[in-house]
Amino acid sequence: MVFYCYYQPDIYLFSLLNQMTENEIEIRVGNAVEIFEQGYNCSQAVFMAYADAYGIEQETAAKLATSFGGGMGRLREVCGAVSGMFLVLGMHYPATDTKDKTAKTKNYDAVQRTAKEFKAEMGSYICADLLKKKHQPENPEPSDRNDKYYALRPCRRCVAIAAQIVGNEITKQY
């Protein structure tokens, strides 16, 4: 038996997002960095910073984004902050009807535009490139968060950039 769950966007929430000011985006960017500094992974930080705008509780957002940290479970593939950005875009530009090619195209267009913008800012959207590490799976145990961790990694900046880019994207009027 197959069950289908359709997400019905809340028009009120979308209107709030479309009216979000630069200052409100900056607050969400700051929240994303703060969430990251609390120990959540890069993907969780970006997605959790915007989850409330889509009626998603923080715990649910953290669960949904967990596996994307460290470039997808420390595989060092697509940066987790970028994946978090894409999760937000999936909520903002949903493609829930399999026959609605227009919705899927709109989502993919937003994904490609924001990925290009992130790459222009950071040089890559691949975790291994950003960390200057070999492109191979690592020990699955997350690194300890300490001053050295934050000093040697661009992750905090990646979180801020991704949160800024997605904030700008979801406030555009089309």
Protein language model features and the residues they cover:
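Polybasic, low-complexity association/targeting segments
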Residues: L17-Q38
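Conserved phosphate/anionic-ligand binding catalytic regions in large, soluble enzymes, centered on
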Residues: R76-L87
